[in-house]
């Protein structure tokens, strides 16, 4: 089914409450169906290309007539090379660009929390739009906070990025796998220039702090956060919202910088005006959620780098 914001009444409702609903069309597959799509892609390609799994690439060398892709046990030569390492390969991509002197510029990192609440709170939005991409500009700092990756009747999950445990969310097409909760991320984008340029390093440091304090992901009731107290196992157990992820109860104010947390709290109160119940005491906040972005690599309109035949594509570019 295709969901769209075209002609929706919620655009006006959001604007009336200082929120902005972005235009978007969504065709939902679900995590369970996504596996089938990937299996079909593999089946389509397996007789046409060679796959090498569990084969880390150490470096890429520029040759006179092409490139060498160097792995631990062997090297592959080619006339043209396409690099597509995704967000998880951000550090690797940065190192390769430095070694090959390919120009890059610093990008951003998105930091925030994953919100979990009863599915009924957002059902009027999710039933029509499925995913609401809503942006809010904070009154205090003028920062933009946005909703991201909304999962109606979904589950909150751990995500391992470069050995750091962060939080994410899934949703399913199969009703048997669905839950009574909806979850979504609230993210604040941070950009850096001079003298500090390591946006990803900044995000990693905050995520590592969460791991250090909670042994992984931390969960906190919204009511506890605004009252300046940590959540305890007893308070989580007595909450009217049953968490779908077994996270460590704690205090997110000891992890996230004040400016980011202030913006997230502002956004929750703003969302409460279009989805009453968002700012309930028992709304759960999991932290931290981080979206890493690669250094922006200098490529032309064909996604080719300064080297003829070396292309850098996807989230890795």
Give the location of each predicted region.
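Residues forming the flavin
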Residues: 1-317
């Amino acid at each position: 089914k295709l969901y769209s914001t075209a002609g929706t009444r919620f655009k006006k409702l959001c604007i009336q409450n200082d929120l902005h609903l972005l235009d978007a069309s969504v065709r939902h597959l679900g995590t369970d169906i996504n596996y089938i799509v990937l299996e079909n892609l593999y089946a389509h390609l397996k007789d046409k290309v060679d796959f090498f799994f569990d084969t880390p690439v150490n470096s890429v060398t520029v040759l006179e007539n092409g490139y060498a892709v160097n792995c631990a046990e062997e090297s592959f030569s080619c006339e043209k090379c396409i690099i597509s390492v995704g967000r998880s390969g951000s550090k690797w991509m940065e190192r390769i660009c430095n070694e090959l002197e390919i120009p890059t510029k610093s990008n951003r990192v998105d930091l925030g929390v994953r919100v979990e609440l009863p599915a009924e709170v957002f059902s009027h939005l999710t039933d029509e739009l499925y995913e609401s991409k809503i942006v809010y500009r904070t009154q205090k700092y003028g920062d933009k906070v946005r909703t991201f990756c909304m999962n109606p009747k979904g589950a909150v999950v751990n995500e391992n990025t470069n050995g750091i445990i962060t939080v994410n969310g899934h949703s399913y097409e199969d009703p048997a796998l669905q839950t009574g909760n909806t979850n979504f991320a609230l993210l604040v984008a941070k950009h850096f220039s001079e003298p500090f340029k390591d946006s990803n390093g900044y995000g990693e440091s905050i995520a590592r702090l969460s791991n250090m304090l909670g042994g992984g992901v931390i969960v906190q009731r919204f009511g506890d956060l605004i009252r300046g107290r940590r959540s305890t196992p007893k308070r989580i157990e007595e909450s009217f919202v049953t968490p779908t992820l077994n996270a460590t109860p704690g205090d997110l104010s000891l992890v996230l910088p004040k400016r980011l947390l202030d913006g997230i709290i502002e956004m929750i109160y703003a969302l409460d005006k279009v989805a009453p119940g968002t700012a309930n005491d028992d709304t759960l906040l999991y932290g931290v959620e981080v979206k890493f972005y690669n250094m922006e690599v200098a490529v032309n309109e064909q996604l080719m780098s300064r080297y003829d035949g070396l292309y850098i594509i996807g989230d890795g570019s």
